[in-house]
């Protein structure tokens, strides 16, 4: 009986999430909001490419499929339960609110004149570490710039693991922007609420989901890069054949 239970438990942990679970999760967590930014990157990289109307749909499909294949059904149920708690729902709402550059500048200027308590700043820093991982930012940046780094591929063998100056600048820029958004979004939360939020974000399943979402973004980027690097050659061949 014990063996059967363990086998059953193991199977349930490996069982992939369903499309419906992924849809529910993205609806409540707003995790796919980051696809808007990646589409903007694609638009800028597609300057000399013919834009296809189904690109946005393909991006969403690839992203959702990756989550579906790398998160188990049990993990999705756990994530849904966490995101349905009042503190996580409030977190999503507050962080989803947009803010103009002018308002953010005014907010940061006010912070200089009226500094936050050390306790609040420490909690924000801890939440930042939980939600923004340097290695994930760096991996995405490298994926985003791979098309332009092929020319220097021959020197890759001599490169060290240490990020380049440009890569480190990108990481710091993302971290600074994310921290400012946290400071602004969480200003309405009490210290106790922030501690509760930090505790929720420390959950192992949220940490895994964040990692998988980051990998999904990179997967989408890689799929896109492969597409736009192959299309120009096809167009050239087509042009030559018509001459």
Where are these regions (language model features)?
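Extended amphipathic alpha-helical interaction segments
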Residues: 100, 104-191
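A cross-kingdom marker for long, charged
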Residues: 180-243
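Sec-dependent N-terminal signal peptides
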Residues: 3-13
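Surface-exposed patches in mature extracellular/periplasmic domains of secreted proteins
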Residues: 36-40, 75-80, 91-94, 138-141, ...
């Amino acid at each position: 009986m014990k063996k059967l239970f363990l086998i059953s438990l193991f199977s349930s942990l490996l069982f992939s999430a369903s499309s419906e679970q992924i849809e529910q999760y993205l609806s409540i967590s707003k995790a796919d909001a980051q696809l808007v930014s990646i589409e903007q990157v694609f638009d800028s990289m597609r300057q000399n490419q013919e834009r296809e109307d189904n690109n946005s749909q393909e991006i969403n499909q690839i992203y959702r499929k990756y989550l579906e294949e790398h998160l188990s059904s049990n993990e999705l149920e756990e994530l849904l339960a966490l995101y349905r708690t009042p503190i996580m729902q409030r977190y999503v709402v507050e962080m989803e609110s947009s803010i103009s550059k002018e308002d953010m500048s005014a907010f940061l200027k006010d912070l200089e004149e009226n500094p936050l308590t050390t306790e609040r700043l420490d909690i924000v820093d801890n939440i930042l570490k939980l939600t923004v991982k340097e290695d994930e930012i760096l991996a995405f940046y490298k994926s985003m710039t791979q098309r332009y780094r092929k020319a220097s591929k021959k020197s890759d063998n001599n490169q060290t693991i240490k990020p380049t100056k440009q890569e480190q600048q990108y990481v710091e820029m993302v971290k600074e922007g994310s921290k400012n958004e946290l400071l602004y979004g969480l200003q309405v939360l009490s210290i106790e609420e922030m501690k509760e939020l930090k505790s929720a974000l420390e959950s192992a399943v949220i940490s895994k989901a964040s990692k998988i979402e980051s990998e999904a973004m990179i997967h989408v980027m890689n799929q896109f890069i492969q597409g736009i690097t192959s299309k120009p050659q096809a167009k050239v061949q087509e042009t030559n054949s018509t001459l």
